[in-house]
Amino acid sequence: RSNFILLKSIIMTTTVVVGGSFAGMTAALEIKRKGKDEHKVILIDKSPLFLFIPSLIWIPFKRREMKDISFKKEGILKEKGVDFVHAEALSVDTETQIVKTDKGDFKYDNLVVATGPKVNFDVAPGVAEFSHYVGTPNGAMKLRAALEEFKKNPGPIVIGATQNAGCMGAAYEFLFNVEKWLREQNIRKKVDLYWVTPEDYLGHFGIDGMPMGETMLKSFMKMFNIHYRTQVGIQEVTKDSVILSTGEVL
């Protein structure tokens, strides 16, 4: 009597994910979870740390430190069977299906590009030179230092978004964080606080609003004495003023 053993041949599919923030990490972990042993997943990112970007708005006020909102991504990826490559992706050859990095080349069957947005600081003259951006670790720390200097000689503050911005939620959060911080520093009465936004109305958020959003925000603006301008862009930023698309100078 003969015994036959059938060996299943596993054809490994390789997916390379470029970028290791929310989209990249989620894609890599989900593809591996669903593909199991038949799917090799490689995540390539130039940073070894995962940064919880939404919490950057707390950094300028010392309510969080960078170590509180970041962790090494390799450990969690390795635990789930995803290979992590700490490298910078330089180019993609779609003909040969190869991602070229500063640490070597990586062949793929499937490719996920999740490198995130690039902020356009050239959207208006002076934005790069005279404004602050809280959306990066370096920017958040520079803003912390700027606020410390601001306390010595307080004056008007303009917070908001430029034309073509698409996600306003964090900016509103930051606005109210600043207002609270000013009160905590006992300098609120010395500061005219402005909110400028390309939104059609307060609380649009880039998603066509939410129930009662406009009503609540109008109430908050009045309650906290925050001046606001909607449906405006930034024409220019100078050392001591913001020129709106309407011509108004703040």
Give a label for each model feature.
Residues 1-11:
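Short, Lys/Arg-enriched N-terminal segments with co-localized hydrophobic residues
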Residues 12, 81-173, 180-186:
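FAD-binding core/adjacent interface of flavoenzyme oxidoreductases
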